[in-house]
Amino acid sequence: MAFSDFAAICSKTPLPLCSVIKSKTHLILSNSTIIHDFDPLNLNVGVLPRCYARSIDLANTVIFDVGNAFINIGALGVILIILYNIRQKYTAIGRSEYLYFFQLTLLLIIFTLVVDCGVSPPGSGSYPYFVAIQIGLAGACCWALLIIGFLGFNLWEDGTTKSMLLVRGTSMLGFIANFLASILTFKAWITDHKVATMNASGMIVVVYIINAIFLFVFVICQLLVSLLVVRNLWVTGAIFLGLFFFVAGQVLVYAFSTQICEGFKHYLDGLFFGSICNVFTLMMVYKTWDMTTDDDLEFGVSVSKDGDVVYDNGFM
């Protein structure tokens, strides 16, 4: 696979962006023949994977990737529970920042459902924009984690206007960078059905390499906090467990999706298990923060019967 070509990835994995990707390398499903000099000028469909989860027809509506849809619907419930638990820790360090991050992930999952389930079907005029928004939100989450990773070092006061502007501003830059890298690449391929360029190196650098670097920095920061600041090996274990789930999810999606799909007779593919791993990764991100932040025992917060927050400054 060339660095700027998605053909090798998309032939194995049914990623949403593959429906708007064009390449000279295509797989002919009827006889499993790979063509390297394919002319995609008048082709509206992107690179087809060797195997993908089958769709179902429900009430005259075609729903794609049903298994992955159920996982993402369940993920919405998990994120809502996490948001509720974060809101209950009134005095925890990084409460506002993590609340914002998980709100971003909630929005990302919603757009993932829109893209994966065919609410905006592949081939429609809106589909490339929804895919670009999904990629942009994923990038925003990665860029937000970059800033959140430094909270444990007390470089600035958490929860302040400055801190929230830093997190929100960085995530907004991440969204813009990933969205533009995606949609400009897509539009170069779909405008007037002409291929101005099939070079996607800019998109690969922004969406994959830069985001991966930011996630790596976040993990290193969390490890330093767990080992040097809070000195809690349970936190370190949660970090490694989350890292394991994340890496396992990427491997299942990008390396073994075809084998999974064929093994499950087209009912499931790598995206199903990748989504499960992503949910567990987010749970470990929350658990890591939960174990490293305790409410101030000298500053109690309770909720009255009328629903008002009551602050009690004193020993509990």
From Swiss-Prot:
Q: Which GO terms describe its molecular function?
A: unfolded protein binding
Keyword Transport (UniProt): yes
Give the disruption phenotype, in one or two sentences: Abolishes CHS3 localization to the bud neck with increased protein localization to the ER membrane.
Kindly state which keywords UniProt assigns to this record, in alphabetical order: Cell wall biogenesis/degradation, Endoplasmic reticulum, Membrane, Protein transport, Transmembrane, Transmembrane helix, Transport
Where are its TM segments located? Answer: 62-82, 99-119, 130-150, 170-190, 200-220, 233-253, 266-286
Q: Quaternary form?
A: Interacts with CHS3.
Question: What is this protein's record name?
Answer: Chitin synthase export chaperone
